[in-house]
């Protein structure tokens, strides 16, 4: 059984905070991809609305995700989400469909 954790996170930047949020998210990619247990952590921008960013994430297990959520840069983005985003961060967990 695959114990990997798949996540999708959506951030909608306040227009006046877009560049600040984008810079913070890019920094998170650089730091997170070095974490033990991070399988992938990809940042995308919506092709129709450049204020919307998405993370596609995969974690080796719950322990790796728990560690990630306690890092200073994740705690900082969670603390600042109401200032930087419209509607906060939308996070979905997914199960991979094997074909």
Question: Where does each model-flagged region fall?
Answer:
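Short, glycine- and small/hydrophobic-rich beta-strand elements in well-ordered beta-sheets
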Residues: 29-52
């Amino acid at each position: 059984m695959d114990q990997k954790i798949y996540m999708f996170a959506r951030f909608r930047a306040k227009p006046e905070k877009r560049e600040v949020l984008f810079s913070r998210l890019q920094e998170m990619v650089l730091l997170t991809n070095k974490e033990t247990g991070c399988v992938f952590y990809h940042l995308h921008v919506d092709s129709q609305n450049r204020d919307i960013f998405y993370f596609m994430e995969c974690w080796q297990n719950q322990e790796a995700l728990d560690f990630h959520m306690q890092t200073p840069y994740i705690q900082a983005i969670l603390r600042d989400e109401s200032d930087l985003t419209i509607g906060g961060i939308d996070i979905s967990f997914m199960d991979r469909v094997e074909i």
